[in-house]
């Protein structure tokens, strides 16, 4: 198998645009620093072409054995493509065992096929920073040293005292006051005497945010608990007014529904508005108002049951 089997032709369209953007992020100055750092640790020459000098993986595996001895036990010297890819895979595995973050790694094809040399450069810079963090001394100052953990242990008393401390993100209440504020529940008017606006004509002016109940009344409402009778057109009873209420509005005359016919209307009975109806509870019947002997009662049997409640 020839060494040119994995080579690709030129890219076009979107692939070419992506490749050009990745190449634009490549830093030649960082490449020169990495070249000096690798050659100083391994003693091997990378060559003028950075990608071709590292694509076989021999120099990179040697670098990892210098940073962490024995991390790559076998280095393939063959020029076959799968041997070179195996070296790159072993180098990536050695970086993981060295403590590299997964986001800082690159794939073998990124270097072997020049797919993403920018990511290769980022990975090698992160490797140099990890080596500096572990105390490696080299003649080239490259990479960023990782920060170390600064752990603090506090006792329970200190932790409880910290609960009373207001962080700077919470703001401050040192300048807050309620001077000039009216008492809670006081009427707030929509006029300002400083602007020479006349005061309201009455005391019904309130803020728009407060709403109003000035027009609410209970005129025409019956007292709570007033008896509501049931009328039935089959029994010859008629409505006294238009105050009829459906059965769904409730029934308060008993705990059962015996004798009720669902679906019929209900009306609120009041002798003031129904002069032809039976007399109010407890009121004596006038002479001649009651039924004579043998005559049926004007009130239907249902009214007589209701009156006995």
From Swiss-Prot:
SUPFAM superfamilies from the UniProt entry: Calponin-homology domain, CH-domain
Superkingdom of the organism of origin: Eukaryota
UniProt repeat feature Calponin-like, residue ranges: 166-191, 206-231, 245-269
A Pfam family per the record: Calponin
Region (Disordered): 273-309
Single GO molecular function: calmodulin binding
Biological process, per Gene Ontology: actin filament organization; actomyosin structure organization
UniProt keyword Lipid biosynthesis present: no
Protein keywords: Acetylation, Actin-binding, Calmodulin-binding, Phosphoprotein, Repeat
Comp. bias (Low complexity): 277-288
Gene Ontology annotations for the cellular component aspect, listed alphabetically: actin cytoskeleton
Modified residues (N6-acetyllysine): 8, 25
Positions where N-acetylserine occurs in the chain: 2
Positions where Phosphoserine occurs in the chain: 138
Protein family per UniProt: Belongs to the calponin family.
Protein name, UniProt field: Calponin-2
Organism of provenance: Bos taurus
